């Protein structure tokens, strides 16, 4: 199958080389030119996911890329999503739906089946859009993963598309990364690489030029451009927790997030990280929970195991002490389930079957069931009747007296989550709460911030996507890029 000129793939020499960001930038750049473009990632491994318009889930990076294309997210944009639930295993999601969990060895054999889903999704996008902009995963030169590859060159070879190779110069060794990656590819794969992009450069480009000249002479391939290091660009991280904060002055609300082993959808906290009046702290193993106005228990892919880890670290006692001194506590999704009295996993969906005691802060019990709830929702927060939008991704069914005091009333008539009698503890299944300006402000006031400055997080994200497209215009060889996409250019 040949889609040359319609499909362009971005691969990286390493993880976090800038693949997601470059694809986002190229998508908006093409969309601004009036090109019908769609993002695509054959296989993603991440615990940050988004709910699509067709009722499935994909990686959040692809949802941001869809926004860059001015499209609603769709499951075809990320047909295979792997959500790790143990150190050696993951839940396998095909076309937005969880199909099974398996260990790494079993998944290696399953890749042939997964590839069928990948090619079917790509074919649908290629038929519907002029350009499909593809993001690879990790590095194409992982020798142990090359057999049955569906994420990098295995996919590129299957659809016969050109590849751009991006490398991060800020971490050092950029020329070794690029040349070394090429050396580890097969002849046909090496031929497929049509150029390089160097990412996160800071300094005088004239001092880099001799290295660029050497690279082109050594490889016979062009450098398509050098993107500058941008410190204040804040798009959602694909998997690693982004702890960077905007410059802040004046009084700030202290918010603490305990980082659990299987934390999921930590992009929930990006609006707080960027809020000028919030001091956000992620606390990891071996650290005590510091004094805070608000503690937020995040989502989790393995709630009972993460609850056990929370206790092992002594954080349960710290949370109770926090409440005794008047602090506020919020649980999101798995965090809500932890706040209840019992958590049951009779089918062993997240590990060994069994039950665990919760923190006992809300009169609730949760039972994990095989059917996962996936919804984009709108509603109103019980605090200040603030309007909000968010999304549900969970397998739990929660029951109990505390549900009579819901955290959110949804527009479809359902009640979501619960509040404690004294009002100091609240839990919800909804991700994305802090992205809604009014709801975020209401939650910050509830936590003790008196004069809240409203921040439009959606506008910040849109601004940064536009800035990325501007960088493409200024720093990359747009003529060559258009040619690789099969688009006319002056």
Swiss-Prot record:
GO MF annotation terms: ABC-type vitamin B12 transporter activity; catalytic activity
Alphabetical list of SUPFAM superfamilies matching this protein: Class I glutamine amidotransferase-like, P-loop containing nucleoside triphosphate hydrolases
InterPro entries xrefs: Class_I_gatase-like (IPR029062), CobQ/CobB/MinD/ParA_Nub-bd_dom (IPR002586), CobQ_GATase1 (IPR033949), CobQ_N (IPR047045), CobQ_synth (IPR004459), GATase_3 (IPR011698), P-loop_NTPase (IPR027417)
Active site (UniProt): 333, 431
Gene3D superfamilies registered for this protein in UniProt: 3.40.50.880, P-loop containing nucleotide triphosphate hydrolases
Keyword list, A-Z: Cobalamin biosynthesis, Glutamine amidotransferase
Annotated GATase cobBQ-type domain residues: 252-439
Metabolic or biological pathway: Cofactor biosynthesis; adenosylcobalamin biosynthesis
GO process terms (BP): cobalamin biosynthetic process
Domain of life where this protein originates: Bacteria
A Pfam family per the record: GATase_3
PROSITE patterns (alphabetical): GATASE_COBBQ (PS51274)
PANTHER family assigned: COBYRIC ACID SYNTHASE, DETHIOBIOTIN SYNTHETASE
NCBIfam families associated with the record: cobQ, PRK00784.1
Family to which this protein belongs: Belongs to the CobB/CobQ family. CobQ subfamily.
Function: Catalyzes amidations at positions B, D, E, and G on adenosylcobyrinic A,C-diamide. NH(2) groups are provided by glutamine, and one molecule of ATP is hydrogenolyzed for each amidation.
Name under which the protein is recorded: Cobyric acid synthase
Species name: Pseudomonas paraeruginosa (strain DSM 24068 / PA7)
Gene: cobQ
């Amino acid at each position: 199958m040949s889609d040359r000129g319609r499909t362009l793939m971005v691969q990286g020499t390493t993880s976090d080389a800038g693949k997601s960001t470059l694809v986002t930038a190229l998508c908006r750049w093409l969309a601004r030119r009036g090109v019908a473009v769609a993002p695509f990632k054959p296989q993603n491994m991440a615990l940050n996911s988004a709910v699509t318009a067709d009722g499935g889930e994909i990686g959040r990076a692809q949802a941001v890329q869809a926004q860059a294309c001015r499209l609603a997210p769709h499951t075809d944009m990320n047909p295979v999503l792997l959500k790790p639930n143990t150190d050696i295993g993951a839940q396998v999601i095909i076309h937005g739906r969880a199909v099974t969990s398996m260990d790494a060895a079993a998944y290696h054999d399953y890749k042939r089946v997964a590839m069928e889903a990948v090619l079917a999704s790509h074919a649908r996008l290629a038929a519907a859009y002029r350009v499909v902009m593809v993001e690879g995963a990790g590095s194409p030169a992982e020798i142990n993963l090359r057999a049955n590859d569906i994420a990098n060159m295995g996919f590129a070879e299957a659809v016969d598309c050109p590849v751009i190779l991006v490398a991060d110069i800020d971490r050092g060794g950029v020329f070794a990364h690029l040349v070394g990656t090429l050396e580890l590819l097969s002849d046909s794969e090496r031929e497929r690489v049509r150029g390089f992009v160097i990412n996160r450069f800071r300094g005088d480009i004239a001092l880099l030029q001799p290295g660029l000249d050497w690279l082109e002479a050594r490889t016979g391939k062009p450098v398509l451009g050098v993107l500058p290091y941008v410190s204040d660009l804040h798009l959602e991280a694909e998997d690693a927790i982004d702890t960077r904060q905007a410059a802040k002055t004046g009084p700030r609300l202290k918010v603490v997030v305990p980082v659990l082993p299987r934390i999921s959808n930590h992009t929930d906290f990006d609006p707080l990280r960027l809020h000028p009046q919030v001091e956000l702290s992620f606390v990891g193993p071996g650290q005590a929970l510091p004094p805070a106005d608000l503690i937020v228990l995040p989502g989790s892919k393995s709630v009972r195991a993460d609850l056990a880890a929370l206790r092992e670290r002594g954080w349960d006692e710290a949370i109770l002490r926090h409440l005794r001194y008047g602090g506020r506590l919020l649980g999101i999704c798995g965090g809500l389930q932890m706040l209840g009295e019992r958590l049951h996993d009779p089918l062993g969906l997240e590990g060994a079957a069994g039950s665990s005691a919760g923190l006992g802060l809300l009169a609730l019990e949760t039972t994990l069931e095989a059917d996962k709830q996936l919804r984009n929702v709108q509603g109103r927060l019980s605090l200040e009747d603030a309007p909000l939008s968010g999304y549900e991704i969970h397998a739990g069914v929660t029951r109990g007296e505390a549900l009579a005091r819901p955290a959110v009333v949804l527009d479809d008539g359902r009640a979501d989550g619960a509040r404690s009698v004294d009002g100091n503890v609240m839990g919800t299944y909804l991700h994305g709460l802090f992205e809604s300006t009014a709801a975020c402000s209401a939650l910050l006031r509830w936590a003790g911030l008196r004069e809240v400055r409203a921040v439009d997080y959606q506008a910040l994200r849109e601004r940064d996507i536009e800035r990325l497209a501007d960088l493409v215009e200024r720093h990359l060889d747009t003529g060559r890029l258009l040619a690789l996409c099969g688009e006319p250019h002056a």
